[in-house]
Amino acid sequence: MKSSIILKELRAAIEEWARVHNIETSLIEIKPTGFGSSVHVLVVARKGFENWPRYERHDSLFDFVNAKVDRTGSDVFISRLSPMTEEEYEKYEGVEV
């Protein structure tokens, strides 16, 4: 199934992005939204986001994933992409991210 392959490639691209930027992740979560084949992507970093504004890390991850994962012909749609620190994650814990 093409969707499951795309999701594996998506996770691998996120892991590579973290390595390239020396980010120590504590959580990488790719979960279905329940609407079609759209997914929410959550990346929580233990280290590496300290001096990196949220919008810049979001744009960097978005650009990296789109360059690495060819979703042409796939029905997988990233409806939310959230790279955050552990502190930001704790602040929003319990809130749908």
Which residues make up each language-model segment?
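Short, non-transmembrane amphipathic alpha-helical segments
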Residues: 14, 53-72
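Short edge beta-strands and adjacent turn/loop segments
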Residues: 20-42
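Generic secondary-structure microfeatures
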Residues: 14, 18, 43-47, 65
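A short interface-forming secondary-structure element
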Residues: 41-58
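N-proximal, solvent-exposed amphipathic alpha-helical segments enriched in charged/polar residues
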Residues: 1-28
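Short secondary-structure junction motifs
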Residues: 23-27, 73-78
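Polar/charged, Gly/Pro-rich intrinsically disordered segments
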Residues: 55, 74-97
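Short, internal active-site loops enriched in acidic
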Residues: 35-36, 46-47, 83-89
